[in-house]
Amino acid sequence: MRIVIQKVSQAMVKVDNEIVSQIAKGYMLLVGISTEDTIADAQKLSNKVLNLRLFETGDQFWKHSIQDVQGEILSVSQFTLMARTKKGNKPDFHKAQKGEHAQELYNQFLDLLKTTLGADKVKDGQFGAMMSCSLTNEGPVTIILDSTE
């Protein structure tokens, strides 16, 4: 499982030019699920997302987690994070988990976040849809998490 986590002051997802989710201060997550991922990977990375200290107090950086600041999370499934580009110029997506299985694990990941942060604090896009994402990245702070590391 791979996640790109971005600290944001606001983020929004649209499908067919309609807003489906939006948040204020918090994280925008892009979540890729591989064919090898299990619930253990979802547990590991949900714990990391919830406890990673990316927020500051005054001039003291890296002091507070998303829980500490009562921030929100906007999560978007993104199979393209599993792309391999070693050969040629066309991305290879064979390592990306297929539809139904990916959606099941993705939903379990969201449930883990909601259990700790609260269902009202965790939003997501529309699984499998073509989405338009917009955000204001603060810092900018962008970190890549990988359950194999």
UniProtKB/Swiss-Prot annotation:
MF terms in GO: D-leucyl-tRNA(Leu) deacylase activity; D-tyrosyl-tRNA(Tyr) deacylase activity; tRNA binding
GO CC field: cytoplasm
Pfam families tied to this protein: Tyr_Deacylase (PF02580)
E.C. designation(s): 3.1.1.96
Comment field on protein domains: A Gly-cisPro motif from one monomer fits into the active site of the other monomer to allow specific chiral rejection of L-amino acids.
Gene3D superfamilies the record matches: D-tyrosyl-tRNA(Tyr) deacylase (3.50.80.10)
Family of the protein in this entry: Belongs to the DTD family.
Keywords carried by this UniProt record: Cytoplasm, Hydrolase, RNA-binding, tRNA-binding
An example Gene Ontology biological process: D-leucine catabolic process
Catalytic activity: glycyl-tRNA(Ala) + H2O = tRNA(Ala) + glycine + H(+); a D-aminoacyl-tRNA + H2O = a tRNA + a D-alpha-amino acid + H(+)
InterPro entries: Daa-tRNA_deacyls_DTD, DTD-like_sf
Subunit composition and interactions: Homodimer.
Record's protein name: D-aminoacyl-tRNA deacylase
Compartment annotation: Cytoplasm
Task performed by this protein: An aminoacyl-tRNA editing enzyme that deacylates mischarged D-aminoacyl-tRNAs. Also deacylates mischarged glycyl-tRNA(Ala), protecting cells against glycine mischarging by AlaRS. Acts via tRNA-based rather than protein-based catalysis; rejects L-amino acids rather than detecting D-amino acids in the active site. By recycling D-aminoacyl-tRNA to D-amino acids and free tRNA molecules, this enzyme counteracts the toxicity associated with the formation of D-aminoacyl-tRNA entities in vivo and helps enforce protein L-homochirality.
HAMAP family: Deacylase_Dtd
Motif residue range(s): Gly-cisPro motif, important for rejection of L-amino acids: 139-140
